[in-house]
């Protein structure tokens, strides 16, 4: 295993070469990861919104956005600015505190989840021993915000949408957690860094998707349900509930629900790429690349190049999954609420339990292949 990418050390070393002290250089570094996380997540959402509009247009043989910037790339920015400048209307009979707090509870946990997402061996803000379960626990907060928004709106459609969101989240959170447990069992860790490292050394053949194909499908289906993507968008079904829990919202509060939804979609695709598709792993290890170039692995410019390749690999896998999610929106019809709950409790949960037991048995029988 190579020593990995020490971006922090390279950054501090570069600043020290310009005459700054170690303490000042470290102080400059401290806010950068958090700032980069917020900017990166925001840019990622803008890209996904544009991609969804263009892919949806192609699926329906339309042109899609084309006037706001080249190929319509500024359309998501225009949509955001429009919502920012719209009036924030609060209906008279709502609970104003819960009505305002609901959208915040939807967005904040999703952004916090990016703290444990690695784009490289040391390209992560917080490498926690229970990182992947932190994501699961944070994702379970969002339905509380949706239920709070629906209840406080004093609207029957909004309340039904909030109740559906809570029921849907509870139904699919358990199979998702069981799929993660199978991966943690093979990796002997809940750290996202350790899970990616466990898949390294064998190129594409080392990815967990080959050892956990059923777990991959369970996780991906449950993640789409958590993101409320078609065919699981029951909480905001327009034909049945007007706009669900969003019915009484306007302006930026209305926009926050969509921000949370798209940020969660990108986050879910990132988690899938980390758990099952090798994360940032590049076919050429850092040590071998350094040997070919006849330089030390700790060389700052080599660290930057390797970090960039890791980020590119992670994003390619992530946006490939987002592309699949967008295509599914225009391929599958919406299910009924009873079908949704029956599928989660009567099919997905038993299959997830069997997959976990099978993984445990294979780990004992083939410890080398399954992380014994």
Swiss-Prot record:
Keywords: Membrane, NAD, NADP, Plastoquinone, Quinone, Thylakoid, Translocase, Transmembrane, Transmembrane helix
Location within or outside the cell: Cellular thylakoid membrane
GO BP term, example: photosynthesis, light reaction
InterPro entries with a match to the protein in the record: NADH_UbQ_OxRdtase_su1/FPO, NADH_UbQ_OxRdtase_su1_CS
Main localization category: membrane
Record-listed E.C. numbers: 7.1.1.-
Disulfide bond positions: none
Cleavable signal peptide: none
Superkingdom to which the source organism belongs: Bacteria
Gene Ontology cellular component annotations, sorted alphabetically: plasma membrane-derived thylakoid membrane
GO molecular function: NADH dehydrogenase activity; oxidoreductase activity, acting on NAD(P)H, quinone or similar compound as acceptor; quinone binding
Entry's transmembrane regions: 28-48, 97-117, 130-150, 176-196, 204-224, 265-285, 308-328, 351-371
Reaction equation(s) it catalyzes: a plastoquinone + NADH + (n+1) H(+)(in) = a plastoquinol + NAD(+) + n H(+)(out); a plastoquinone + NADPH + (n+1) H(+)(in) = a plastoquinol + NADP(+) + n H(+)(out)
Membrane topology: Multi-pass membrane protein
Family recorded in the similarity comment: Belongs to the complex I subunit 1 family.
Function comment: NDH-1 shuttles electrons from an unknown electron donor, via FMN and iron-sulfur (Fe-S) centers, to quinones in the respiratory and/or the photosynthetic chain. The immediate electron acceptor for the enzyme in this species is believed to be plastoquinone. Couples the redox reaction to proton translocation, and thus conserves the redox energy in a proton gradient.
Assembly description: NDH-1 is composed of at least 11 different subunits.
Stated name of the protein: NAD(P)H-quinone oxidoreductase subunit 1
The species this protein was found in: Picosynechococcus sp. (strain ATCC 27264 / PCC 7002 / PR-6) (Agmenellum quadruplicatum)
